[in-house]
Amino acid sequence: MNSLKKIKEWLNTFTPFNEQEQVDCQHIRQFLEEEPNLLLRNNVKMHFTASAWVLNPTKDKVLMLYHNIYQSWSWSGGHADGEGDLLSVAMKEVKEESGLLSLKPLLDMPLSIEI
């Protein structure tokens, strides 16, 4: 599968939460047509990252990780680095950053999209 095909499919079925997400989706669609290397972080104009919101089994707690570089708490995430399956990217980042081994995605598409 074309590495950007899944992202294009997500964008076509994604329902924006608000006007800003709608505008961001339009910009991302445009960039997908114009930029060949959106999966690589060396694209300084724009590139894809993926993150995950990790819940406990009862869904009443969320995992936050302390980011030493930025000196702040955040959810897990990272750069696509050439990988077009952003769910896989998000899952890989959670495992690397948290040490969790067993993960079960609740959704197979994005919760939010932003630039």
Language-model segment annotations:
Residues N2-K6:
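Non-transmembrane, interaction-prone alpha-helical and coil segments associated with secretion
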Residues T13-S51:
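Acidic, metal-coordinating catalytic segment for phosphate/diphosphate chemistry
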